[in-house]
Amino acid sequence: MTDIDVRLREDVHVLGELLGETIRQQHGDAFLQKIEDIRHSAKADRRGPGEQLSSTLADLAEDDLLPVARAFNQFLNLANMAEQYQLIRRRDADQPEPFEARVLPELLARLKQAGHSNDALARQLAKLDIQLVLTAHPTEVARRTLIQKYDAIAGQLAAQDHRDLSPAERQQVRERLRRLIAEAWHTEEIRRTRPTPVDEAKWGFAVIEHSLWHAIPSHLRKVDKALLEATGLRLPLEAAPIRFASWMGGDRDGNPNVTAAVTREVLLLARWMAADLFLRDIDALAAELSMQQANDALRERVGDSAEPYRAVLKQLRDRLRATRAWAHSALASNQPAGAEVLVDNRDLIAPLELCYQSLHDCGMGVIAEGPLLDCLRRAVTFGLFLGRLDVRQDAARHRDALTEITDYLGLGRYADWDEEQRIGFLQAELKNRRPLLPAHFKPQADTAEVLATCREVAAAPAASLGSYVISMAGAASDVLAVQLLLKEAGLTRPMRVVPLFETLADLDNAGPVMQRLLGLPGYRAGLRGPQEVMIGYSDSAKDAGTTAAAWAQYRAQENLVRICAEHQVELLLFHGRGGTVGRGGGPAHAAILSQPPGSVAGRFRTTEQGEMIRFKFGLPGIAEQNLNLYLAAVLEATLLPPPPPQPAWRELMDQLAADGVKAYRSVVRENPDFVEYFRQSTPEQELGRLPLGSRPAKRRAGGIESLRAIPWIFGWTQTRLMLPAWLGWETALSNALARGQGELLAQMREQWPFFRTRIDMLEMVLAKADAQIAEAYDERLVQPHLLPLGAHLRDLLSQSCQVVLGLTGQPVLLAHSPETLEFISLRNTYLDPLHRLQAELLARSRSREAALDSPLEQALLVTVAGIAAGLRNTG
């Protein structure tokens, strides 16, 4: 065990000890002993038959349910924070830098060895276009209040690490930790009400303010340093290889709470926040830049001022204050922006560049390269809007709106027309100079909302908006329909309208749809920049299982690369990944390097979801590491793409996908008991009551198809069966081995990044799965006639584990990563009581109608949050 591991264990021990002291102070020694007994029972059950813990928990008095659940939940959150801090802990001089810090310098060295010139490397790095899209899917269980306390705890762990602390200072740190842990313990874990879409957007702004605002300039300093050392060239000031966008306040797909008014409010809040953040920077810079000497360009701007830099910054500060004041007042009224309000990012960047260049010209480069450069990097990356807001809506809503319009105009029903009729109508109207809608048209509420959203898009500054994403897109007309509605709303500038292909059938049809669209007269001429296409991971996996979905996603991307090349159109692929393997999640670095050759051509757009935003970007140091990984992976996939898969690999993957989807659907769609079993064995129905996000957990009607991908995954994750992430693989891989294709599978795993990444992610999720825990839920919750189905699914889980072990040649899952295995083992001691307690609470809750704010229901919600924290993902 390394010294680093020892320090992590020490941190976890200290945090656990302080939590125990806090619990003792509120509940007494006897209760704390009860917690210890439960923990020891959990350990004993892992070694024995596994009945001690369940009987201990079944005997708990009603009043003990909530504090017991809270104790284990709090410990897992504290362990998470210790692990997160461990990732960014200062290394001693004799310890190697972490992979995340080395990845870019080592990649640049490899690229030079591969024959890339210094100029080519610098040029490609400067023009990288990586967009991380923050989304508010309801997977962030922890409250923002608690997250801030956990972040403060990380700060005290860092303070504790300083070697030169006096005993008194060390004691002060310990007292601060004790106080923060007490504050967390005495704070409710669960929101009493659902957040609004505006609350979610504010949470996104908080991630930028507290973490990304600091991480970006630090990350770009290191990129600049690595590039300079490798090539002798600098990263240009105008380069922003990574930018941010958001769906919070723009994603109205299935969420009636996201209205046109909400989108307008979120856009204004973003402008207010951006102005406020830049004002803080400018105030600090004005205090520093007191120098008198300036170049001619700056003097021309401010005359003979004794403090020319402060004079320039004062002008910018006045405009930022005017912008902030206007955004604040515009939230309450439709007040138009005055001339002083900043709208163009160049008006923010130019004064900063002027100061930077003047300082260099006057021999004060060391000052220019300080906080001024950091502010400039922020201005280029975040701009006046922090990031671009995407709009997303279901294709059916646009079809319904156009149907009402054509019906009103006496043209027939748009919904009843075939694809050629729709395209003919849409193209003719797009060319037509007259409005489509008469002024006196009074649409139904749903159509009125679609049109109002389009008007907000048309009215907003171009730089504040990203893409208009069409979910469940299935035809070229779906794209033209949005273009027509935007034209009707008064949009005169180009905007990316992005089809999202989600189901297995839609992914298979993505190529033909885009072939038709790009072949339409005038369509390509209207493109400004690349054609963006979104690939959906969540719904395709729920529809067909991850075996078939992963291959369909890969093939769809290959087809899109080929078709766009044929039409001489640049392609930007937008990856709609979730946080879990069942929704396309997994380590970003490996995922990017496993994309089809040519699909990452210097551009990459992906969603970052829910609790994964906190784990990957919640602390500046960790955010910086993840930004490094994204940048290095996109650069490598662009300049050193993997070779295309061999025909034999493709053929076997076709067969694996066919066997996988058949096995998956035979359980999920064809077994008449499956839906009932799912609802009884998991907390799926109770999750609908959890005030997680602003979006409803179900679509309007139906069975499994109506469930959104997130509660579908969330339910199985809570019981540790993890079914959506592996079901289908056990049959597909077993069949391949039975056909004597073991050597070919081994070759694919060794030589094909796509297949290796799939198997690695499968192994990770199987290591987190736990048949014993899943069985405990069945024993407590499932009616006798459904128990055989649960046993069958656990047999399939065991089969999955065995076939993966056979493929990897390891004695146990994750044998190659003992540290990860140790983390899982450590967490199980605290997760097991939460799982068993959750099953007990579900049984009690279902046997009687409990009020949402009763101790029983509150305890149930705390177990949900604790398990999500312990597994580091939810949906």
UniProtKB/Swiss-Prot annotation:
InterPro entries per record: PEP_COase (IPR021135), PEP_COase_bac/pln-type (IPR022805), PEP_COase_Lys_AS (IPR018129), PEPCASE_His_AS (IPR033129), Pyrv/PenolPyrv_kinase-like_dom (IPR015813)
Annotated GO CC locations: cytosol
Cofactor(s) required for function per UniProt: Mg(2+)
Name of the coding gene: ppc
GO MF annotations in UniProt: magnesium ion binding; phosphoenolpyruvate carboxylase activity
Any GO BP annotation: tricarboxylic acid cycle
Catalytic residues of the enzyme: H137, K542
Function field: Forms oxaloacetate, a four-carbon dicarboxylic acid source for the tricarboxylic acid cycle.
Species name: Pseudomonas putida (strain GB-1)
Family as reported in the entry's similarity comment: Belongs to the PEPCase type 1 family.
Keyword terms, alphabetized: Carbon dioxide fixation, Lyase, Magnesium
PROSITE patterns: PEPCASE_1, PEPCASE_2
NCBIfam families: PRK00009.1 (NF000584)
Keyword Magnesium among record annotations: yes
Catalytic activity from the UniProt record: oxaloacetate + phosphate = phosphoenolpyruvate + hydrogencarbonate
Protein name: Phosphoenolpyruvate carboxylase
One Pfam assignment: PEPcase
Keyword Magnesium tagged: yes
EC numbers: 4.1.1.31
